[in-house]
């Protein structure tokens, strides 16, 4: 065979060698047992939460205090490991995995909002220019411009009529209002010289309180200084307007329908004919609609106004006062002067200067009011957390007591760019809600006594097992503590698993806290202090609830109470309506529920003596020390005699063995 033929035959042998490798690889992988599969109950452990670690530290500290052991890092670690091992070593009874325990929980500051109603106290509305608009000033708003205008869909309930502004049923409608002051005469032919301010305000539905007699209307008349009978006198400076609250002689109705009756006792200044002393036929002394529409037709188009008549022009309802609407039916609530500050900021205000002159035409007196405007002032009004403004196509349904709005925007400020085709709904963050939550274990104020007792028995009987358990706990501390997370609910269906409430409330807490942050450089301003007091009041109320409640040991962001949820007494539809903010006869009786929960919390204060339980564990663990065993054995006389006899017997045996050798 020549070399060329050998080269042609060599490759097949190499191919057989290469084909042998995959077979060897497969043989190495071949097993005789079935492939092991993870059981459905096997779950990946999550890292421990801060609440769990904090609670574990508190329990360890309490244990060291009760046992009078010095708190060192080593002792704290051992105490924490001991507590974790006690809880983990509890044998789970059959069917316990499927057990479901449902309790009432109080969740402070959830990610929910409610409507501000006419029965709520007035809120703080801040303006950027206090020269022309009275009220607290703050030109730093909005605090977070990047969050202005976030889209939201809402469906919330209400008990009392909500506060709404705009052209929709249940909302106060906007209109232009004028305020007039008289300045010193600057011309011999001028009877009066005026400064007038025009701005957006609240539209009266009825000029006077016609639905009640004058005597009955006095029942709703607020206390305050009556409005002046003469036009207020001001200086020549058109850049200053002094506001002074006063009460008019009669009220106007802003709303009178199924949503309630809302009135306002602020003056509504208008030009009208003064017919006193006139012998000829004089137009009605009531405000002329034509004149009124001519004065207030538009704040943009008309920069010159002229009123002419053979009769003197008179300004009715003197006074420079802002509207202060209040509800009088079906309930009587407080005044809300802050609403006007939101309305007036929706469009710039216009400043007028002019006079009233007297001439003679056809041998008759002829009166002319001439007003000119060359100055407009843009405004901005803002609210601060926990309050917000929902802007959009808001629909209020009185039959179901619900408010809906799709594709609405969340704002904190209103300025002259606002479009009155939308409506404004005042909302605020919910202070807290009561909801049922489910747990996979019974409620406990601390690691329960029976768990510690049962585990302690096993540990004392098998001390080696305790050592191995301790090592296992050290190796898997993160996985162990992660199993203690609590459960939560789904808002729109029923009671569900627990992690939902924790994440739900944690995210909302971060949201409200970020919105309520205060600029420390300007913390000395009174407005910041005022808003901080309002916000802290809600926090103190939440803390008051927490102090009165006995909470489950494994939760800190919200409180799971020992009160068991009874579905037959409070069905889920009642809970759902409570979450929506509806407080009718079908919703939860919160006051009664609180009373029951506070009683249950008080009863559990003495049912879980953690001090005795931890002390018992400490005594049991002390018995594991071999030194104590020797000390105890050596302290008895009988045992000592037996030991001496045993030693003598052994010595005797040793002596005999040595003699035989």
From Swiss-Prot:
Full protein name: Endogenous retrovirus group K member 25 Env polyprotein
Protein family per UniProt: Belongs to the beta type-B retroviral envelope protein family. HERV class-II K(HML-2) env subfamily.
Membrane spanning stretches: 633-653
Pfam family, one: GP41
Disulfide pairings: none
Stretch list, region Disordered: 1-47
Subunit: The surface (SU) and transmembrane (TM) proteins form a heterodimer. SU and TM are attached by noncovalent interactions or by a labile interchain disulfide bond.
GO cellular component term, pick one: plasma membrane
Species whose genome carries this gene: Homo sapiens
Record GO terms (molecular function): structural molecule activity
Note from the entry: Has a type 2 genome. The HERV-K(HML-2) family contains type 1 and type 2 genomes depending on the absence or presence of 292 nucleotides at the 5'-end of the env gene resulting in Env proteins of distinct sizes. Despite their overall retroviral envelope structure HERV-K(HML-2) type 1 envelope proteins lack a predictable signal sequence. Subgenomic RNA transcripts coding for full-length envelope proteins have been detected for both type of genomes.
Residues marked Cleavage (site): 465-466
């Amino acid at each position: 065979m020549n070399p060329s033929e050998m080269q042609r035959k060599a490759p097949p042998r190499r191919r057989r060698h290469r084909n042998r490798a995959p077979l060897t690889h497969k043989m190495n992988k071949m097993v005789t047992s079935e492939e092991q599969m993870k059981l459905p109950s096997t779950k990946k452990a999550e890292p421990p939460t801060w609440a769990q670690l904090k609670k574990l530290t508190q329990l360890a500290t309490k244990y060291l205090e009760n046992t009078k052991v010095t708190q060192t890092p080593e002792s704290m670690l051992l105490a924490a490991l001991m507590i974790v091992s006690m809880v983990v070593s509890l044998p789970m009874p059959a069917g316990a995995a499927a057990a479901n325990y449902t309790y009432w929980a109080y969740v402070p500051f959830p990610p929910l909002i409610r409507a501000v109603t006419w029965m709520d106290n007035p809120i703080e509305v801040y303006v950027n220019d206090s020269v022309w608009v009275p009220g607290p000033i703050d030109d730093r708003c909005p605090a977070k411009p990047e969050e202005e205008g976030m889209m939201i869909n809402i469906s919330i309930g209400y008990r009392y009529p909500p506060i709404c502004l705009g052209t929709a049923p249940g909302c106060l409608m906007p209109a232009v209002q004028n305020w007039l002051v008289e300045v010193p005469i600057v011309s011999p032919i001028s009877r009066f010289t005026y400064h007038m301010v025009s701005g957006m305000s609240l539209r009266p539905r009825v000029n006077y309180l016609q639905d009640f007699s004058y005597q009955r209307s006095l029942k709703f008349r607020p206390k305050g200084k009556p409005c002046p009978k003469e036009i207020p006198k001001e200086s020549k400076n058109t850049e200053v307007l002094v506001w002074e609250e006063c009460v008019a002689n009669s009220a106007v109705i802003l709303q009178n329908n199924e949503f309630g009756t809302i009135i306002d006792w602020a003056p509504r200044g208008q030009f009208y004919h003064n017919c006193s002393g006139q012998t000829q036929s004089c137009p009605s002394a009531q405000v002329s609609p034509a004149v009124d529409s001519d004065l207030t037709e538009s704040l943009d188009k008309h920069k010159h106004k002229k009123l002419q008549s053979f009769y003197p022009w008179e300004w009715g309802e003197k006074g420079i006062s802002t509207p202060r609407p209040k509800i009088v039916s079906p309930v009587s609530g407080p005044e809300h002067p802050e609403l006007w500050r939101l309305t007036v900021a929706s469009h710039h205000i216009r400043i007028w200067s002019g006079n009233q002159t007297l001439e003679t035409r056809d041998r008759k007196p002829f009166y002319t009011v001439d007003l000119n405007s060359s100055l407009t002032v843009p405004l901005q009004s803002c609210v601060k957390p926990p309050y917000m403004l929902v802007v959009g196509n808001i629909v209020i349904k009185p039959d179901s007591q619900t408010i809906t709005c799709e594709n609405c925007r969340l704002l904190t400020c209103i300025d002259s760019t606002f479009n009155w085709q939308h409506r404004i709904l005042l909302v605020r963050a919910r202070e807290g809600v009561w909801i049922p939550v489910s747990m996979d274990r019974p409620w406990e104020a601390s690691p329960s006594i029976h768990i510690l007792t049962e585990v302690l028995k096993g540990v004392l009987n098998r001390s080696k097992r305790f050592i191995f358990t301790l090592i296992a706990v050290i190796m898997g501390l993160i996985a162990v503590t992660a199993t203690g997370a609590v459960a939560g609910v789904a808002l729109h269906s029923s009671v569900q698993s627990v992690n939902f409430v924790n994440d739900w409330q944690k995210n909302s807490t971060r949201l409200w806290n970020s919105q309520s942050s205060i600029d420390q450089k300007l913390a000395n301003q009174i407005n910041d202090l005022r808003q901080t007091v309002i916000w802290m009041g809600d926090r103190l109320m939440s803390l008051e609830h927490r102090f009165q409640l006995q909470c489950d040991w494994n939760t800190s962001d919200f409180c799971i109470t020992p009160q068991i949820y009874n579905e037959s007494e409070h069905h889920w539809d009642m809970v759902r309506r409570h979450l929506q903010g509806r407080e009718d006869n079908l919703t939860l009786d919160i006051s009664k529920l609180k009373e029951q929960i506070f009683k249950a919390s008080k009863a559990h204060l003495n049912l879980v003596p953690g001090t005795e339980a931890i002390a018992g564990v400490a005594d049991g663990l002390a018995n594991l020390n071999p030194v104590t065993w020797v000390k105890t054995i050596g302290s008895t006389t009988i045992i000592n005699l037996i030991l001496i006899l045993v030693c003598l017997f052994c010595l005797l045996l040793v002596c005999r063995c040595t003699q035989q050798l």
